[in-house]
């Protein structure tokens, strides 16, 4: 059974005030505090080079360049000079600001660093050229510079001269030796000892030739000055046979650039060819592990292991065979009786077919002289 519900619709219904009780709401006022304000004056950046202008020249920044600490450079720090791009067409006032910045350039503690001095020299030259080109591009150049500009122009060269000194630089060829070989590079070095280098270069001579003492000339009673025949190295150099130089052959005036080598050559091409001797020995014998500079020397050495002896003595009744032609030539002296090596001591006239035998014989004289 559905219930009956009554609905009534009223318009502009108002609730009497005596039925609903209204309460007053108290609103507290908000405290008012004075906040201090600052007036900020912004600089006119229309002419600033950072915002597209050109009143300020490019700044020069010294940035630290940290090296790899894995190679022992823990306490070393390099300075890298970095400049911003040059802005063309700036006015004379910019040049004055650039001169002021030169006096504020940061310098390292040690001004004796040659590489840093060279960099400063190039920077000073660049600043001077920039100043000159700016004055030439001026629309109305003044005939007589102002006192301030003249003082600044005259003071800058003096300052750079006092800081950089009178050192001159030149390019030199340096030999660099690596695991793969030796090569030459061009480096800048101070030209402080030009006179000493010229004197040393003029005094460079060919190493002394003692071959005449092996052919019959006798030694002086006091011996050769600066030569100790008891030293195996000096004795080997003394008994070393040097090739004869023809009369028309030019003198050898180019020294070997390798440290410790005193050989001389006719030209730089011959010296560069000789430098391969000081290079790495990459051709290794698989039998004994001996290394050689050239593959031809390795092939000649391998004859010792194979037992091959292609060089045979042609004298009747001999028939000896040798692996090297040099050994065959030395052997032939036995048949010919040729003994080109003569004892250089005055009291001895013995002769030998090989220089090694003469070297052994000289040691007997040296031992007798040192132990009378």
UniProtKB/Swiss-Prot annotation:
Residues 154-165, 186-196 have a biased composition (Polar residues). Expressed in kidney, liver, spleen and testis but not in colon. The keyword Transcription regulation applies. Residues 126-172, 186-210 are annotated as: Disordered. It is found in: Nucleus. A zinc finger (C2H2-type) spans 254-278, 283-305, 311-335, 341-365. Residues 137-146 have a biased composition (Basic residues). PROSITE patterns: ZINC_FINGER_C2H2_1 (PS00028), ZINC_FINGER_C2H2_2 (PS50157). Residues 237-372 are annotated as: Mediates transcriptional repression. InterPro entries: YY1-like (IPR017114), Znf_C2H2_sf (IPR036236), Znf_C2H2_type (IPR013087). One of its GO terms (molecular function) is sequence-specific DNA binding. Functions as a multifunctional transcription factor that may exhibit positive and negative control on a large number of genes. May antagonize YY1 and function in development and differentiation. This is Transcription factor YY2. It comes from Homo sapiens (Human).
